[in-house]
Amino acid sequence: AMGTEIQKYNLTEEDFRGDRFRDVPGMMKGNNDMLNITRPDVISDIYRRYLEAGADIITANTFSCQRISQADYHLEDCAREMAFEGARLARIECDKFSTPDKPRFVAGDVGPTNKTCSMSPDVSDPAAREITYDELFTDVCEQVDGLIEGGADARL
């Protein structure tokens, strides 16, 4: 999958940060979605290799491109941009390989978040929630909007 492919590049903390996120606190390595912004060459290369191998549909590198997950990295304000760029890069590569007889498609990846609105994080307070349904809905809608604007044909 995408994470395994990214690991093959042996990227450094500096690769993940790029110049733009140099001063953001905390570790960024492992936040694969930010590579849509900081290392689009790597992400595009991965997409291209899937298409060269014969893929008809490629999954965009957008699994955690919502504010909820990106808040752990202090990048919640970049979540929509990450989703957009992940889909846009995939769309560019798919368009290079598409033909009238064999179109290629982009599936925007909408992964789960690291917070849930269905279970309490506190065993002594079963009604407690880390996030509300409305917050979750709003964040996922923002991610999906970025995917659509970036050119995704479908959402996973």
Residue ranges of each PLM-predicted region?
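Domain-level signal for soluble alpha/beta catalytic cores
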Residues: 1-156
